[in-house]
C-alpha cells in the first residue's frame, strides 16, 4: 500500500490530494414492516441482504444496516484509497465507534493486516494509547477487513478547511507539534516508520470548539470570528503504510506535499523521512498553507531550493537513474530550463525563503520556530533532527 495512489495524486495542480468527504445521513426510508429496522419480528438482529461490492471493491451498505449483530451503521464518515470509514453504534459497549471497512482487494487486505499488527504493537504502553488511535476490535466480514476504532474528532486538515485555512495560533502549533513528535518518537523506538504523516492523519480527540473574535475587521467594521479547538489533544491515525523495520528502503512513500528529498532523489529512506513530513506539517499549521504545493518532482525540488537553498552536491550526485534527469552536469538542478510550463515557473517564484514566509505569521522575535523548521527540513537525513532531538528544541521549552 506504500506507493498506492501517489501517481494519481500528482497529476493535477491541486492543493492536496482529494480529501475525505463528510456526508450527512440521508433520510431513512420508511419501513414496510412494523418492526425495528435490522431486527426480525422476534427481535433477533438481522444481517443485511448479500450485495455485490461496487466495481472498486468497496463494501455496499445502507444506513441503519447491521455490520454483524454487534454494530449498527449510522453514517458515512469518510472514504479513501483503502476503503470507507463508517460511524457505528456498538451494542456491546453502548458507544459510538468508527469502523474502517477495507476494500475487498488483496493488496488492501494485506495492508490492513499490517496496520492491525502495528496497532497491536502501539497499544502495549501508555504512550501508544494516549498518542495513537486505539483499535478496539477487528473482524473479517464478507471478505472485507473491518477495523474498529475509538471515535475521534475532525482531522487538523478538516479543521483548517472549515476555518477557511486560517492559521492556528503558535501556542497551539507548539502543543500539536509536541504531541506529534512524541507519537513519532514512540513509533521509532518500536522500529516503526509511519511514512504518511500529514494533517489528514492527525485527528483532534474532541469535536468541541470555541468561537473567538478575530483581529481582522471588515470594511463595515464588523468583527470576524474564528473557531479554535476546545482541547488541543490529538492522536495519530492511518498506519496502513507503516514499515516495521529499520532497513533502508527505496520505494516511493509519503503523500506528495510531505515527501522528503531522499525519496524524490531515490537515495533510500528510513525514520528521518517522518521528520521531514513533520516540518512541512508544522509550517502548514502555522501559516494555513502547504509549504510545497506541487505535483511534479522537478518543480518540487525547485521549490525546496527556493525555500531552503541549494540541494547538497553529495546528494544530487548520488541521485538514482530516474532522478538524474532533474540535474545538469550531475549536480545543478535543471531549473527553470526543465520546467514543463510557465505556470510552474511562476509557482516556484511565488515562494519566499522559509524564514521570510514564517515571519509573515510569527513575530520575528520568535525565531525559535523557524530554527526548529530548518532542523526538521535539513536536506541530508543524517543532519535532520530526530524526534527526540526536536522535542529538546528551545521552541518547546518556551511559552511565548
Swiss-Prot record:
Catalytic activity as recorded in UniProt: L-seryl-[protein] + ATP = O-phospho-L-seryl-[protein] + ADP + H(+); L-threonyl-[protein] + ATP = O-phospho-L-threonyl-[protein] + ADP + H(+); L-tyrosyl-[protein] + ATP = O-phospho-L-tyrosyl-[protein] + ADP + H(+)
The keyword S-adenosyl-L-methionine belongs to this UniProt entry's keyword annotation: no
Catalytic residues of the enzyme: 196
CDD domains found in the cross-reference section: PKc_CLK
EC number: 2.7.12.1
Domain Protein kinase intervals: 71-396
GO MF entries: ATP binding; protein serine kinase activity; protein serine/threonine kinase activity; protein serine/threonine/tyrosine kinase activity; protein tyrosine kinase activity
Record carries keyword Kinase: yes
Positions bound to ATP: 77-85, 100
Chain positions covered by the region annotation Disordered: 1-29
SMART domains (UniProt xref): S_TKc
Keywords: ATP-binding, Kinase, Nucleotide-binding, Serine/threonine-protein kinase, Transferase
GO BP annotations, alphabetical order: protein autophosphorylation
Family that this chain belongs to: Belongs to the protein kinase superfamily. CMGC Ser/Thr protein kinase family. Lammer subfamily.
Protein name listed in UniProt: Serine/threonine-protein kinase AFC3
Amino acid at each position: 500500500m506504500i506507493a498506492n495512489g501517489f501517481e494519481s495524486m500528482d497529476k493535477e495542480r491541486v492543493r492536496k490530494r482529494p480529501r475525505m468527504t463528510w456526508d450527512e445521513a440521508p433520510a431513512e426510508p420508511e419501513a414496510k414492516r412494523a418492526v425495528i429496522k435490522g431486527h426480525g419480528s422476534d427481535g433477533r438482529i438481522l444481517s443485511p441482504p448479500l450485495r455485490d461490492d461496487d466495481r472498486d471493491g468497496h463494501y455496499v451498505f445502507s444506513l441503519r444496516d447491521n455490520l454483524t449483530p454487534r454494530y449498527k451503521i449510522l453514517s458515512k464518515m469518510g472514504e479513501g484509497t483503502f476503503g470507507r470509514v463508517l460511524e457505528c453504534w456498538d451494542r456491546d459497549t453502548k458507544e459510538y465507534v468508527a469502523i474502517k471497512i477495507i476494500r475487498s482487494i488483496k493488496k488492501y487486505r494485506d495492508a490492513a493486516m499490517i496496520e492491525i499488527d502495528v496497532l497491536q504493537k502501539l497499544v502495549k504502553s501508555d504512550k501508544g494509547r494516549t498518542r495513537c488511535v486505539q483499535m478496539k476490535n477487528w473482524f473479517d466480514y464478507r471478505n472485507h477487513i473491518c477495523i474498529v476504532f475509538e471515535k475521534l474528532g475532525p482531522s487538523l486538515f478538516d479543521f483548517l478547511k472549515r476555518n477557511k485555512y486560517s492559521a492556528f495560533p503558535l501556542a497551539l502549533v507548539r502543543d500539536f507539534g509536541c504531541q506529534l513528535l512524541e507519537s513519532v518518537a514512540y513509533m521509532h523506538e518500536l522500529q516503526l516508520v509511519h511514512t504518511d504523516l500529514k494533517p489528514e492523519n492527525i485527528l483532534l480527540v474532541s469535536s468541541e470548539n470555541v468561537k473567538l473574535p478575530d483581529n481582522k475587521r471588515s470594511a463595515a467594521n464588523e468583527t470576524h470570528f474564528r473557531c479554535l479547538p476546545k482541547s488541543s489533544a490529538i492522536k495519530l491515525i492511518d498506519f496502513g503504510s507503516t514499515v516495521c523495520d529499520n532497513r533502508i528502503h527505496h520505494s516511493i512513500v509519503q503523500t506528495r506535499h510531505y515527501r522528503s528529498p531522499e525519496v524524490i532523489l531515490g537515495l533510500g529512506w528510513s525514520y528521518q523521512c517522518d521528520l521531514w513530513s513533520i516540518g512541512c506539517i508544522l509550517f502548514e499549521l502555522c501559516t494555513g498553507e502547504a509549504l510545497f504545493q506541487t505535483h511534479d518532482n522537478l518543480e518540487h525540488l525547485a521549490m525546496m531550493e527556493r525555500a531552503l537553498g541549494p540541494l547538497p552536491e553529495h546528494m544530487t550526485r548520488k541521485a538514482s537513474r530516474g532522478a538524474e534527469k532533474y540535474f545538469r552536469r550531475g549536480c545543478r538542478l535543471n531549473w527553470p530550463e526543465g520546467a514543463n510550463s510557465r505556470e510552474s515557473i511562476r509557482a516556484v517564484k511565488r515562494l519566499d525563503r522559509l524564514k521570510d514566509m514564517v515571519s509573515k505569521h510569527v513575530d520575528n522575535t520568535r525565531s525559535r520556530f523557524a530554527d526548529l523548521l530548518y532542523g526538521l527540513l535539513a536536506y541530508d537525513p543524517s543532519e535532520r533532527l530526530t524526534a527526540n532531538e526536536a522535542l529538546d528544541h528551545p521552541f518547546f521549552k518556551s511559552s511565548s
